[in-house]
A protein has these predicted regions:
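Core of compact, soluble alpha-helical bundle domains
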Residues: 1-131
Length: 131
């Protein structure tokens, strides 16, 4: 078993993001959705995710933007979010411990719930996200 450490730096965030997306890309259920959307722009996506989680978890404000709009039209149902959460949480649990690791899992869960409900809303109306 690996020694689990706290999430304290951008290096920890990069480890979290890189290992998580390695699992996502290999996953039979959600991997194809990510590959179709991101295509050859993985370096840019990973950099954006570093900044997002650095802002959320370390309170170092390097991410500016709206995370939801790129997800608004994805062909996903709750099962996809469950898999995303399962991969994210197990990735955290395999490598990290402590308050920030628990906060990362809590925030990921809240984000998945919010994205799921917003995606359902936009599927059932003619409205589109503002940002």
């Amino acid at each position: 078993m690996l020694d689990r450490k706290e999430i304290l730096s951008i290096e920890d965030i990069k480890l979290l993001v890189d290992t998580f997306y390695e699992k996502v890309r290999k996953d039979a259920l959600i991997g194809p959705i990510f590959e179709d959307k991101i295509q050859d722009r993985w370096p840019e996506h990973l950099e954006r995710m570093y900044r997002f989680w650095q802002t959320v978890l370390l309170e170092e404000h390097t991410y500016f933007g709206s995370p939801f709009p790129p997800h608004a039209q994805l062909p996903v149902v709750w099962e996809h979010f469950e898999r995303w959460l399962s991969l994210f949480n197990s990735n955290i649990d395999d490598q990290f411990s402590g308050k920030i690791a628990e906060e990362a899992k809590w925030r990921a869960n809240k984000m998945a719930e919010m994205f799921y409900y917003k995606i359902r809303h936009y599927r059932n109306t003619d409205a589109r996200p503002l940002f």
